[in-house]
Amino acid sequence: MKKYKDNFNNIIIMSYCIVTGSGGLVGSETVRFFSNIGYNVVGIDNDMRKYFFNTSTQSITDILKSKYSNFTHYNIDIRKKDELETNIFKKLGNNIKCIVHCAAQPSHDWAAKEPHTDFEVNAVATLNLLELTRKYCQKASFIFMSTNKVYGDNPNRLDIEELETRWELKGRGSIDENMSVDHCKHSLFGVSKLAADAMVQEYGRYFNMNTVCFRGGCITGPNHQGAELHGFLSYIVK
């Protein structure tokens, strides 16, 4: 039994998980999870939240660096494919078992302020990561934190029933991934995330890669660096 346990430990020691947006709400929790189960975790975060919203994730990054000896942080802009390749993907190669892509420009209003920046961060940078994964660690799992905003305003067309304490979907339990993402208004943020979402799916089907999109919405928590344009629940509580 000890032999098998040792072999398992050796596998984990050589296994790396890449987390983009590692100082953010979801990214930092992902770092904690994979660090706690024994993976070497590489976090990528250049604190663009400071540029977007004048708030910072640096304090979260500092906590992670001090707490986890198996966590390494890289201050790299995910739009810079060459830096990602040289510093991380080329060095680690097939030892990368998982990429959890959480980094994003996450605000509807901010996207309209700088559409090019929004699309480069959300869509083009996702393509960078997909290509590097395909080139250096094609069997790795690629997990993309998408958004329910890919559905645009299509949910507004659903039949809603007013109950005593809440609104509920009439005649159906929930909304699944079969809902259309087409013929609707999204916001520029929703469109850039939709482009990335579709690309992640396509790399899975076209190149037979292990990809998945998680379409969350209005996520918050104790480590959310809330700002007026993003993370509003956290912002008003603080």
Give the location of each predicted region.
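Conserved non-cysteine loop/helix-boundary elements of the Radical SAM core domain that shape
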Residues: 227
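N-terminal Rossmann-like NAD(P)+-binding domain of SDR-like oxidoreductases, especially those catalyzing
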Residues: 4-219, 224
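Glycine-rich phosphate/pyrophosphate-binding beta-alpha loops
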Residues: 231
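Alpha-helical substrate-binding/gating segment
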Residues: 234-238
